[in-house]
Amino acid sequence: MATSDVKPKSISRAKKWSEEIENLYRFQQAGYRDEIEYKQVKQVAMVDRWPETGYVKKLQRRDNTFFYYNKERECEDKEVHKVKVYVY
């Protein structure tokens, strides 16, 4: 299967915050499912991350505007249930 053909097999909602959920939240705020879809659409090999935390630092939306994120956690507890977790 080609990389561009990767589709999720299932989806669930996040129950509690983790570093993985934090990064998924950032991708979904920018309009992508996750890092896999972002890399497919934008044709990039690496995503800008904060070296201290490993969280996503900057994402380019589909309309070519940029989202910039802080080093600290941005996904509040009340937002966690909105994050979709895709399984491939």
Curated annotation (Swiss-Prot):
Interacts with PACRG. Interacts with MORN3. Expressed in the testes (at protein level). Expressed in the ovary. Several isoforms have been identified differing in their 5'-untranslated exons. These isoforms show different tissue expression. Some are expressed in various tissues, including lung, liver, brain, testis, oviduct and oocytes. Some are testis-specific. This is Meiosis-expressed gene 1 protein. One of its GO terms (biological process) is manchette assembly. The gene is Meig1. One of its GO terms (cellular component) is manchette. InterPro entries: Meiosis-expressed_gene_1. It holds the Pfam family Meiosis_expr. Disruption phenotype: Mice are viable, but males are sterile, producing only a few sperm that are morphologically abnormal. Spermatogenesis is dramatically impaired at the stage of elongation and condensation. Spermatozoa exhibit failure of flagellar formation, disorganization of sperm axonemes and deformed heads. It comes from the Eukaryota. Belongs to the MEIG1 family. Essential for spermiogenesis. Keywords: Differentiation, Meiosis, Spermatogenesis. It comes from Mus musculus (Mouse).
